[in-house]
């Protein structure tokens, strides 16, 4: 008997009587024992779908297949006839990084502490980016190439993540999950003329007056806004060309029938009152997918179908795992909408806005198929806070210019208000641009109540860490290892509920003053913070709290609480000591404490003049801070320009 045959028999513990088999029988046995396991592996690999994500940035569903005939999107329009188009898909934030954090983890950014734009959070040990589960199951996972997750992803998240990452580098017959991101339609592709020209090179550009027919009513209709809107359509066409190239590559490789393709955008239009906001202009996105016939379950993925099923992009990760035959981990807050063993369809989707670059504004949103509810936790902040990035764009500049002339259209004037409503409710079927707030309409009182309750239940269930000041989150991360631990760890107690109630109380007015004063003695800084904010909101009606506010401002261990107390005293007409405290925090505080102090000084306008020199001295970059502390520099630059009548520009 040949030696290799003996070795095979020994390795597989075959009985010695095998030696008496005929050569033909032996060959059959050889195939059964040796080859079939390998063939089974290959068959299992072939049975699992490849999954291709083609994502883009900063676009709402302004595509031909979504009913915009002036959009030039032939590849996506054709793709929609081959797959399923979702009319009610939404993001969890109106800006890229917090949304991408939710997508890659299947968890809300407000649970993880990745909610502030441009932060550096840490994940708790048990939470992993979902591609790691695919890799463990044998998938080849690539990302080309944007990450922007708000945390440093583990090294084994991807097999490859770079501008060269591609599914074609996988092993033979290995299933793949590949992501390609088109960045050309980012807001910078509209605002930056050179980028716009590069992205749209070789394309026939849209007629500006024609596409202006879809210009939203909250923009002034001027040549410059029409130009921005036309550029927006142009970069969408460039993206459509890119999309078609990726589908063609899949066809050329003979993989179209083996690959589920999902197209989505990371948030809405990259223009004011859309990007960064929780209106549909910022939250509603295109979502189209194509499922080869052999991978369809029931009615899932039938070609040419439009569905109004509510989808949140937090569901993409769990869905991708589910269609790959992997049970999503229990900690994920997203839910699968394709594959086997699906949960009940969503009744609500949720969104959050927190710090956008250099400006804080805590806003939450709840959406059903018809209604949108918005809770403004800081309604005394002006609607259009000054932020460097959007202010560089022509549309924002036109809004400012036309507002100064007093000729803004009524819809645009709504968003020049120095304050916001505490709550907003919109019937998106009758009012798709969300201009008519129904909160005070008696016919919608029950709907308002239901949506408000859904919001508070979500805040509680998901443990919304966005209600904690960022400087306090930073301290908690250092103490516990991750922001998640602050409200989910063993020491949290009922902090989650106390925080929710204190934040809600801050908007309750003078009648809630005794309860707000009580929160000033809470043992957690975040609760004290909201008590001071609430008292400041009612200005001189909270005068009986002045002694407690003075004590907090001078003695509290938390700079966030001291800043909130100083703000309250300034709003009550007692700025002297308050300005000194804000100046001291500006000099010596941590980066996020300094930013909050700078914002309060900016919001006090000319009241801040006594600390003008301190503001000038602190308009400097500091190493060791996120982006060298540029956000504080931006706020101080804006404040100084207003106080001095200057026009200095900072990056």
Task: For each feature predicted by the language model, list its residue ranges.
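N-terminal secretory signal peptides that target proteins for export/translocation
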Residues: 1-25
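Long, internal low-complexity/basic segments
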Residues: 3, 7, 12, 45-49, ...
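Short, basic, low-complexity termini and linkers enriched in Ser/Thr/Gly/Pro
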Residues: 8, 38-39
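Formylglycine-dependent sulfatase
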Residues: 26, 41-417, 432-453
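Bacterial N-terminal signal peptides
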Residues: 26-38
């Amino acid at each position: 008997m040949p030696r290799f045959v003996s070795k095979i028999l020994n390795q597989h513990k075959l009985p010695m009587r095998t030696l008496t088999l005929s050569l033909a029988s032996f060959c059959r046995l050889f195939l059964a024992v040796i080859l079939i396991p390998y063939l089974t592996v290959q068959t299992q690999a072939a049975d699992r779908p490849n999954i291709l994500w083609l994502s883009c940035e900063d676009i709402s569903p302004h595509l031909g297949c979504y009913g915009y005939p002036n959009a030039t999107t032939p590849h996506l329009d054709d793709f929609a006839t081959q797959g399923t188009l979702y009319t009610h898909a939404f993001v969890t934030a109106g800006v890229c990084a917090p949304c991408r954090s939710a997508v890659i983890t299947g968890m809300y950014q407000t649970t993880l502490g990745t909610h502030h734009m441009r932060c550096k959070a840490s994940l708790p040990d048990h939470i992993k980016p979902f591609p790691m589960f695919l890799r463990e199951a044998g998938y080849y996972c690539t990302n080309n190439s944007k990450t922007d997750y708000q945390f440093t992803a583990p090294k084994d998240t991807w097999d490859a993540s770079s501008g060269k990452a591609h599914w074609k580098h996988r092993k033979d017959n290995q299933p793949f999950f590949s992501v390609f991101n088109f960045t050309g339609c980012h807001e910078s592709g509209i605002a930056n003329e050179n980028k716009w020209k590069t992205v749209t090179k070789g394309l026939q550009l849209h007629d500006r007056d024609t596409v202006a027919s879809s210009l939203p009513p909250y923009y002034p209709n001027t040549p410059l806004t029409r130009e921005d809107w036309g550029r927006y359509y142009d970069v969408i066409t460039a993206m459509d060309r890119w999309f078609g190239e990726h589908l063609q590559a899949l066809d050329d490789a003979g993989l179209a029938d083996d690959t589920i393709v999902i197209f989505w955008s990371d948030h809405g239009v990259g223009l004011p009152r859309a990007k960064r906001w929780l209106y549909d202009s910022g939250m509603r996105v295109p979502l189209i997918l194509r499922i080869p016939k052999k991978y369809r379950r029931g009615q899932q993925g039938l070609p040419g179908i439009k569905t109004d099923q509510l989808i949140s992009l937090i569901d993409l990760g769990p869905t991708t795992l589910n269609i790959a035959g992997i049970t999503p981990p229990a900690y994920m807050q997203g839910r699968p909408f394709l594959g086997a063993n699906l949960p009940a369809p969503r009744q609500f989707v949720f969104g959050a806005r927190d710090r956008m670059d250099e400006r804080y504004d805590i806003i939450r949103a709840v959406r059903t198929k018809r209604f949108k509810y918005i809770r403004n936790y800081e309604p005394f902040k002006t609607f259009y806070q000054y932020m460097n990035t959007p202010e560089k764009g022509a549309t924002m500049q036109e809004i400012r210019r036309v507002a100064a002339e007093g000729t803004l259209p009524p819809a645009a004037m709504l968003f020049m208000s120095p304050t916001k409503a505490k709550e907003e409710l919109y019937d998106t079927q009758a009012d798709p641009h969300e201009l008519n707030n129904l909160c005070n309409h008696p016919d919608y009182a029950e709907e308002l109540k239901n949506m408000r309750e859904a919001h508070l239940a979500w805040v509680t269930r998901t443990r919304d860490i966005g209600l904690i000041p960022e400087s306090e989150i930073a301290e908690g991360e250092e103490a516990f290892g991750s922001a998640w631990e602050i409200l989910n760890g063993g020491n949290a107690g009922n902090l989650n509920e106390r925080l929710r109630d204190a934040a809600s109380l801050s908007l309750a007015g003078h009648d809630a003053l005794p309860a707000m004063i009580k929160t000033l003695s809470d043992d957690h800084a975040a609760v004290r913070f909201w008590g001071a904010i609430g008292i400041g909101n009612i200005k001189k009606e909270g005068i009986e709290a002045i002694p407690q506010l003075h004590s907090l401002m001078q003695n509290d261990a938390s700079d966030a609480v001291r800043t909130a107390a100083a703000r309250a005293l300034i709003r009550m007409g007692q700025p002297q000591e308050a300005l000194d405290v804000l100046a001291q925090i500006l000099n010596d505080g941590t980066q996020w404490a300094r930013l909050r102090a700078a914002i309060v000084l900016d919001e006090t306008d000319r009241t801040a003049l006594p600390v003008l020199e301190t503001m000038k001295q602190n308009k400097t970059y500091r190493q060791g801070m996120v982006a060298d502390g540029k956000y504080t520099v931006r706020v101080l630059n804006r404040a100084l320009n207003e106080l001095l009548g200057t026009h200095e520009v900072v990056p």
